Regions:
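C-terminal, non-catalytic macromolecule-binding modules
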Residues: 77-93
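A short beta-to-alpha transition loop/helix N-cap that caps and shapes the active-site region
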Residues: 19-22, 72-74, 168, 175-178
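Surface loops and adjacent helix of pleckstrin homology
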Residues: 53, 74-77, 171
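Acidic surface patches and DE-rich sequence motifs
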Residues: 42, 66, 92
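C-terminal helical cap and adjacent loop that interface with cofactors, partners, or active-site loops
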Residues: 58-62, 88-240
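Residue-level detector of conserved, well-ordered beta-strand and adjacent loop positions
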Residues: 51, 65, 169
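Rossmann-like dinucleotide-binding domain that binds NAD(P)(H)
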Residues: 1-47, 51-58, 143-147
């Protein structure tokens, strides 16, 4: 969205169901599916594929195909490098077809590179604080933030509707806000009620006892002791 100054208009969601024969899923206390893909249709006609979940070969990779070349972060060796590719007939004379380099952030490079997700963990907080300091709205303002988050909600609606396309409403428009004003659709068990969806395409199910026991041990080792996620030392979780 930032690079192309576009927003998603429609989404299709697809999932790989929960696999009880996969130890990484069976021993998890979460009630969710293995992985998911969201296909977003942007308002300029572009298509974005977002793949995420509990798949082997974990990594954070971005690949962008434009009409003047390709840019992606490297999947081998130093993964913070960028690879830029231009077709031989589209590049300038003397310009290489392929360039691989490690970029610097234009601001706060040192601090950003010491945080996770390639600097993303730093810049989310940095730009939030800059908005407070300067009283200026950042590019990723509340509406663009909603655009990004509601794409996932609508994609889950799509999953439960045989992956049919669903709109991503633009809440800058009063008519769209009015249409969804009383929409409280959520798979959160804390909001359970009539018409609320499950968090897995397989429906509602309970993690097995061994998975819950393991979760208690892990969370206790990190100091979480209650279902309110209060940090009170190294006590055990009382419940999930």
């Amino acid at each position: 969205m930032y690079i192309t100054d576009t927003r998603p208009e429609k989404v299709n969601g697809f999932v790989i169901p929960f696999d009880a024969s996969d130890p990484s899923m069976a021993m998890s206390a979460t009630v969710a599916d293995t992985a998911a893909t969201i296909i977003c249709r942007m308002d300029n006609g572009a298509v974005v594929k977002s793949l995420h979940g509990h798949l082997r070969g974990h990594g954070n990779y971005v690949r962008i195909h434009g009409n003047r070349g390709l840019m992606e972060n490297c999947r081998h060796g130093e993964k913070n490098r960028l690879r830029v590719w231009k077709e031989p007939w589209e590049k300038k004379r003397g310009e290489p077809t392929e360039t691989v380099y490690r970029p610097d952030f234009p601001v706060r490079h040192g601090e950003a590179t010491r945080t996770g997700h390639g600097g993303g963990d730093f810049f989310t907080t940095y730009h939030f604080l800059e908005a407070i300091r300067t009283d200026k709205s950042p590019y990723l303002d509340v509406y663009r933030g909603v655009d990004m988050s509601i794409a996932g909600i609508q994609a889950w609606r799509s999953v439960l509707d045989d992956s049919a396309p669903y709109e991503v409403p633009d809440f800058r428009k009063e008519a769209a806000r009015r249409k969804y004003r009383n929409d409280h659709w959520s798979p959160d068990p804390g909001r359970a009620g009539k018409g609320q969806p499950p968090s897995s395409i397989l429906g509602r199910f309970e993690p097995k006892a061994e998975a819950k026991d393991l979760a208690r041990e892990v969370w206790a080792s990190r100091g979480y002791v209650t279902d309110r996620n209060q940090r009170l030392g190294n006590h055990r979780l009382t419940r999930i």
